[in-house]
Amino acid sequence: MNGHDQHDQHDQHDQHDGGRDAGQRDEPAAPRLDAAAFTTLRITEGEDRLHARLDRPEVRNAIDATMIDELHALCAHLEHTPKILILSGSPSTDSGADGADPEARPRRGVFASGADIAQLRDRRRQDALRGVNSTAFDRLAKLPMPVIAALDGHTLGGGAELAWAADFRLGTPALRVGQPETGLGIIPAAGALWRLRDLAGEALAKEILLAGRILDAEEALAHGLVSEIHPSQELLDAADALAGRIAAQDPLAVRISKQVFAMPREAHPQVDNLAQAILFESEAKVDRMQAFLDRREARQQDPEPNREQNREQTTSGETA
């Protein structure tokens, strides 16, 4: 993909979507992404979710300018056609220090080892002021539907900042996550300096940001940086299961909840009341509540055959 063409497309999408608000109905579904046009992301798109796999395994999925362009294209599509996004990384085929044939080495899990250092070394003041990575990650964080990051192995530098932009993070026992930028003479300027304070608390955030602390999976789980740990071979199934639970909710209610959650404290409770006013007028609210009442009435009239169903609904969080 050509970077300049991509940015022109992004501007067109932004101008087209800029006036939409969360209460408006979605337009008819746009055509699906042309997965073959992407070179650094592997795209699998379904009806309610899209899986994007970072795919530069020879450099441990380092984030380069092309990947940033493709993340913008991905965001433009999901802004126009809201779906749950699952992010993951291709296993590494990096030959390592021994120079062995990548095909002969065992493939190790990796989400993203950071920004492409060769490109980063050559960037100058004007590149920093453009916010190359931060703009893309912030756009991803503001997508209408939730973003799930499935983290296996190294999740460092820009890779960690991409993960912090997600709404949910799942990991594997091989997870190693941190921000080593200060050791390279720069700062993590794509979101870690302000997102980590909220995610991990000030004390741990400073250890990660100022002292280069790298957390393993259990530490990341204990501090809430990931919500679940799964064996590597089960990670994507777990991400899909989470996406399925989200997809079972009303899409508009999910989208509005995500937007309201991100509002500053001083916007509440007024913004909550306005959001609820939108949802109170939606057909989905009436339909879903009527279906709930119908199920409850059926259980009350004939409770025995519905005992197993009651147990399943209680497990899923539904109550009568």
What are these regions (language model features)?
Residues 23-31, 279, 283-291, 317-320:
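Intrinsically disordered, low-complexity segments enriched in small/flexible residues
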